[in-house]
């Protein structure tokens, strides 16, 4: 059982992850900021926050690390995420993102030779079916363009996660990747310089998304991870789409699409089935 400090850090990290969806959707729905400006400001403030946190740590100075492949994946994630939330509600976007990330990680495992048992295969098909159900044509389906962009964002984040495994100090790697991603953001700003829009509220949302929900949120999550098993770390992330949907309804006044609750149950239930055998093995080994 995680200690109280780990539990608190975990709750704060999940709120930060859900907060990214809420801040991005609120900015692009209710303010004048455009998706390109939001992306660039989010990456800039995230890089700044991570650099500050890296500097303040009580250990020998660690330079920012990471690499260009990780930075490219991070940029694609952030840009597609912003463009998707021009059209999607917070809960729908978070579910598509989360589902795409988990499917990407699972497929990567299969390509490495990992095998799925019967229960895990059922879970994979259930989660995939939930995503497809959400995307089926109909009055309550999310806009296809926004949905595809969010799936691309999830794919990119899954690749970013895979590239970061075994890369050393996660905070230093994240700081380096955010810093490098600014080069891609600058190119995007140049390409769309005549279409950029900004106001005070949009600026504030973008800076909060980058500095708090992204930079500080990732740092809090990295601090919580040593106190969690791998299965616990994967399982608690099941809460993010639910938190985003509930907070979107409460704070942004977004209606819950009729397909969202059953799709959420299918996706999260399927992922829980995938994790359950590993959780059982971990519990037996720790007994």
UniProtKB/Swiss-Prot annotation:
Keywords assigned by UniProt, alphabetized: Cell membrane, Membrane, Repeat, Transmembrane, Transmembrane helix
Any one Gene Ontology cellular component term annotated for this protein: plasma membrane
Residues covered by the EamA domain: 15-136, 155-276
Ranges that cross the membrane: 7-28, 32-54, 67-86, 91-113, 120-139, 144-163, 170-192, 202-224, 231-253, 263-280
Membrane topology qualifier: Multi-pass membrane protein
Protein's UniProt keywords contain Nucleus: no
Record-linked PANTHER family: AMINO-ACID METABOLITE EFFLUX PUMP-RELATED, INNER MEMBRANE TRANSPORTER
Protein name stated in the entry: Uncharacterized protein PA1977
Species of the source: Pseudomonas aeruginosa (strain ATCC 15692 / DSM 22644 / CIP 104116 / JCM 14847 / LMG 12228 / 1C / PRS 101 / PAO1)
């Amino acid at each position: 059982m995680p200690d109280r400090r780990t539990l608190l850090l975990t709750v704060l990290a999940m709120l930060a992850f859900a907060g990214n969806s809420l801040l991005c959707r609120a900015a692009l729905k209710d303010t004048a900021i455009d998706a390109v400006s939001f992306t660039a400001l989010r990456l800039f403030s995230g890089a700044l926050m991570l650099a500050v946190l890296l500097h303040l740590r009580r250990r020998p100075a660690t330079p920012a690390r990471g690499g260009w492949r990780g930075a490219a994946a991070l940029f694609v994630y952030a840009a597609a995420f912003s463009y998707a939330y021009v059209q999607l509600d917070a809960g729908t976007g978070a579910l598509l993102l989360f589902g795409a990330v988990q499917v990407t990680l699972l497929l990567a495992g299969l390509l490495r030779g990992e095998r799925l048992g019967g229960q895990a295969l059922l879970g994979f098909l259930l989660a995939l079916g939930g995503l497809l159900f959400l995307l089926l044509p109909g009055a309550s389906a999310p806009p296809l363009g926004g949905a595809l962009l969010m799936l691309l964002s999830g794919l990119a984040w899954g690749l970013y996660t895979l590239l970061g495994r075994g890369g050393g100090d996660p905070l230093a790697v994240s700081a380096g990747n955010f810093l490098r991603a600014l080069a891609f953001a600058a190119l995007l700003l140049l390409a769309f310089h005549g279409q950029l829009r900004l106001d005070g509220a949009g600026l504030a949302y973008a800076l909060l998304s980058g500095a708090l929900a992204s930079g500080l949120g990732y740092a809090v999550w990295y601090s919580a991870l040593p106190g969690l098993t791998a299965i616990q770390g994967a399982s608690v992330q099941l809460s993010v789409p639910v938190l985003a949907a509930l907070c979107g309804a409460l704070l942004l006044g977004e209606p819950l699409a009729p397909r969202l609750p059953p799709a959420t149950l299918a996706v999260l239930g399927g992922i829980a089935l995938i994790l359950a055998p590993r959780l059982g093995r971990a519990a037996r080994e720790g007994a």
